[in-house]
Structures are given as C-alpha cells and as structure tokens.
Amino acid sequence: MKFALFTTNLAGGGAEKALAKIASGLAARGHAVDFIVCEYAGNYPAPVGCRFHVLAARAGHGWLGKRRLAWRLNRWLAANPHDLLVSTLPFADEVAALARMPRHVCRIANTLSAEIARLPAAKAQRRAARYRGLYGALPLVAVSQGVANDLQTEFGIDADRVSVIANPFDFAAIRALAAEPCPQRPREPYILHVGRYAAQKRHDLLLAAFAQADLPQQLVLLTPPDAGLTALIARHGLQRRVVIADFQANPYPWMAGADLLVLCSDHEGLPNVLIEALACGTRVVSTDCPSGPREILGGELAQGLVPCNDANALAQAMRAALAAPKPAADLVVSALAPYGAEPALDAWEAIAAAK
C-alpha cells in the first residue's frame, strides 16, 4: 500500500518523532511511504526508508500561507496517489484539510481541551471553534484513550469517528541505542527531564520541586538552551545543580543512566518519554495530567503519579521513587505490552485497507 504522512516540520517534539517512527515502520513492512513536511526545519532526520518531500523552505502560518501550502500539497499528492494520508498537529491538519485530498485521517497527539484551557478566554473560544470546525467532519485517530475521550466529551466528536492507535515503540532498538557510548553523560548521579522549554512542560514546577526535594543528584535537562530557562534556574539558585544538555538525537543512554526520569507537564497526549524510560529500566515519576500517564503507569507503577501543579507532591514522589527499589521486571513488561510497534502498524494498515 501507499502511505503519505504529513506534519509541519521535524522539530524535536514527540508527535513528529512518533510520526517518523510510524513512517519507518510501515516502510520496513514493504509499503511505499511518502513523508511530507510543510517546511524544512527541526532536529530529527528524515525517516529511514521513506521518500521525503518539503513543501516550502519556510512555511507561512497565516491565512494565505496555509492556502499556498495546501495548493502545493494537493498538486504533489495528485501526482503521487496514496491509499491513506495521515496528518498530525493542528497546523498540518488544517493544511491537509484545505487540500481536500481523499482518504485523509488526522492523528491527534495531544489533549486539545487542556491546551485550550491555558489560553485567555477570548482566544480559547476561537481556538475551540477552530478545532470543532476542523475535526468535526474528518476521521480521527487518537494516540491514547484519554485523547479520544477528550475529543468526544469536549468537542462533540462522534465516538464512531475516533479510533485509538498508540505510538509504536521498538523496544529492542531502544535498548540497543541505550547501550551506545555517551561520553557527554554526567558521571555523577542525576535525575532527567526530557522536553522543550514551553509552558506546557512546566520547568518552573520541576525546578521548584527539585529545590525542595534537596536530593544529592544533579538535574539534567535535555532541551535546547534558552535564556528564559537559564534565568529560571538562577531564580531558584540551582546554577550548580542543573545541567542543560541540549536536544539529543539519541536520548536513550541518558535515560538508561538516570536514577529517575520526571515528567511534570500540565497536559500530554501519550508521553513517549515515560514509555522509553521504562524500556531503559529507569524509574519514572509523572504528573497525572491529561492524557496518557495514568494509562501507562497502572498498578503499582501508579505510585509514581502526582497531582498537576503541586511542587510539594512532586518533591515527595521524587524522594520516594529514589528510595524504593526499581519496579519489578514483570510490572514493566506488562506496562509496555500495549505499546509495541507491531499492533500499531497493524492498525494503520487496517485503516488504509478499509479506505
């Protein structure tokens, strides 16, 4: 079959990374896969085994820019027929919808109502109306059950138009990459956070909890340097205890070497880093945010979940996780079972075959 996978760019976010893995996985199964981006920007390489196409050197994000991109996408896909077009992230979803191509599915990678809740009231109303108009008539694939529930309850999407397909993970490949040499990794014990410096990711909460926990470990942040983040670290007096280690194309040695991985977001869709850290044998603590962490951390692993926006609870959970033994192997295997690559790729093939 022929697949076209489309997103804004290859920036360092989880949605782009997951879409690239879907593309590579489908290509490895012998399918013809075109990976298309609006603009040439980002940290990730083009997915292996795919034809890579860029619509513009720099994408205009306004009314006219979206329509120019949609025209280019329409022309390119008309000349390169496909069995399924999968777009992800709202900007790319809008461009793909404007292109009016057949067999188009939007992959929803975040909890949209939680994203909207952060906005001022007037802007939140406009954003909600925009999403209802965009997603109200298209088939959707949510990355977690929480995202699917959000689409149905908050945006009025009919349940029969929303499927759930988790992000695919090749655990053998993750563990092999985790074993690669990593001379940049600190020799001293450390706690790890992976995620761009953005309000959603709550570095302010992380730093407040880390300062309060008073742990012997360093805190390592895998994110590009940012003046705002540096200033925030200084305000907490943590300049000597926090390392900004930039974006890492291979974060897995950093995960494997960490005493603990912390996720403290206000909202997610299906946080890849929790699954990847568990696959690397690392303890995890996470805010119980919408959506994904509670689906991943079930049973005894749910002890690592804390309320959102509670630095005291996060500090206590960090101390408790570091004092406890690592989770038993059978618990980790059970937690990871729903997230293997094969079930996800099977599901995408089934959607393409049914269109």
Regions found by a protein language model. Give the residues of each.
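Conserved acidic donor-binding segment of nucleotide-sugar-dependent glycosyltransferases
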Residues: 299-312, 319-325
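Aromatic "clamp/platform" in nucleotide-sugar-dependent glycosyltransferases that forms part
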Residues: 247, 266
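N-terminal strand-loop element at the rim of the active site
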Residues: 5-13, 17-64, 147, 224-227
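Short hydrophobic beta-strand element within catalytic cores of glycosyltransferases
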Residues: 283-287
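Membrane-proximal helix-turn-helix segments that form the acceptor-binding/catalytic region
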Residues: 71-75, 122-140
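A conserved mid-protein helix/loop that constitutes part of the nucleotide-sugar donor-binding site
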Residues: 16-21, 189, 193-212
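A short, active-site helix/loop in glycosyltransferases that binds the activated sugar's phosphate group
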Residues: 137-162, 169-171
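Short His-centered aromatic/hydrophobic patch
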Residues: 86-93, 108
